[in-house]
Amino acid sequence: IYQIIEHLLAFEKYKKLVIYTNGMIPLKADYRDLLLNEKIVFSVTDYGDLARNTSGFVKQLEDWGCVYRAHPPEHWTDSGRIAKQHRRDDQNQKLFDECCGKNLWTLSDKGFGRCPFAVNAAHLGAFDFADDSVVAVGDAEKLKKYVVDQNFLTACDLCNGRAFSADEITPAIQTRTPLTMEL
């Protein structure tokens, strides 16, 4: 992730790079100077008893002098269901344009995604990781096109939408049974 952060900081059009985290994975001390970049801000969601390492992570940010905001879960919408929406391209473009998650870059063990929904849907088998919704980290040419030129993702047609104006739901409720995908 540190190489990706370094790469994204090189883009002049990005004035801030917000790193959203639950603080479960501690930061590597070797990258302290990188993380002190004036463009970087951490947004740490504290899930209370569901995430035991958050307070230690926040202390690490404080000790290092990183800019951060720690907060409980907020602004959750009903956007976690994976179901084929059968939209036209222009409708998916509109959904993407209004989406609050289209720039929530998400790194996984299999690729890099524009939004956590796309990465999670790919992990659950809704589409292949070779799809346009997630790219391999090592493919610099495709990564640049993905970051700069993407109009919408294939994953958009599986998403209910995450507009800033969407109704909010109670956050962090864990399901007792797996949800089904309607593909």
Predicted regions located by residue number:
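Distinct, well-ordered alpha-helical segments
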Residues: 1-6, 27-34
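Conserved strand-turn element in the central/C-terminal portion of the radical SAM core barrel
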Residues: 42-49, 66-102
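Well-ordered, non-membrane alpha-helical segments in soluble/globular domains
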Residues: 3, 52-57, 90-92, 139
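Core AdoMet radical
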Residues: 12-26, 39-74
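Accessory C-terminal segments flanking Radical SAM cores
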Residues: 82-183
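Flexible, charged surface loops at secondary-structure boundaries
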Residues: 35-36, 150
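Short low-complexity, flexible loop/linker segments enriched in glycine and/or proline
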Residues: 33-34, 58-59, 82-87
